[in-house]
From Swiss-Prot:
Gene3D superfamilies for this protein: Urease metallochaperone UreE, N-terminal domain, UreE, C-terminal domain
Organism whose genome encodes this protein: Bifidobacterium longum subsp. infantis (strain ATCC 15697 / DSM 20088 / JCM 1222 / NCTC 11817 / S12)
GO cellular component labels: cytoplasm
Predominant location: cytoplasm
Subcellular location: Cytoplasm
Region (Disordered): 160-194
Annotated Basic and acidic residues bias: 177-194
Keyword Metal-binding among UniProt keywords: no
Function text: Involved in urease metallocenter assembly. Binds nickel. Probably functions as a nickel donor during metallocenter assembly.
An MF annotation (GO) of this entry: nickel cation binding
Keywords for this protein: Chaperone, Cytoplasm, Nickel
One GO term of the biological process aspect: protein-containing complex assembly
Gene: ureE
Name of the protein described by the UniProt record: Urease accessory protein UreE
Amino acid sequence: MQTKGGSRLMIANRISGNIISDTFSDGKLNVPIEFEWFEADKKRMRKVAADGTEFGVAVGATIADGDVLAETADKRYFARIRTAQLIEIPVHSMKEMGRLCFELGNRHLSLKVEDDRVLVPYDHPTMEYTKKIGFDPRVIEGGFDGFLIVKAHAGAGTIVPGTNKTTGDLAEEEQETERHEPHAHAIGEHHHEKSEYEVNGVLHRADGMHSHDHGQTWHMH
């Protein structure tokens, strides 16, 4: 697939491993593609890897830190989830844990539960709310790994850094966009535009370009 500027857009539509948990001995260069924590479960997005390669990402699953999204002959592209400000909330009993998780669940917050603490992405209202209900939260910097990602509705969830929108607002906007694009296809899905025709398994376009991989990449001899 070609970008508007004419450069090649690579497609990432599956996760083929993880550079943190798996061992690779093929000598390929690991190249990161950076994601914010709230992008980890988006259905479709455009990203740029550290080497400048553009990607259309639609893996159909929540992306974890280190997930391998694409490979070439000499490179392995993996997800790097940026660290974020988190609220660490210590708990001292199962009763406290149950009460806290109930309160956070009502706010549709993504969270990570450990033996003696609960972690949620930072926003000021959540910080103040946990103080109000009797806990002693503090702000830390950490990776957003192993979290339970909660699907929030509009107006609920965590406020996304740098915006006045919540994770629920962003999810609803994505759904609304899909509703207004009835003929849209997932990135990497095989389909033919009206201006394309197929001969012996090769797609051709009126501008002379052709594709051997069902329209994912185009070139001209």
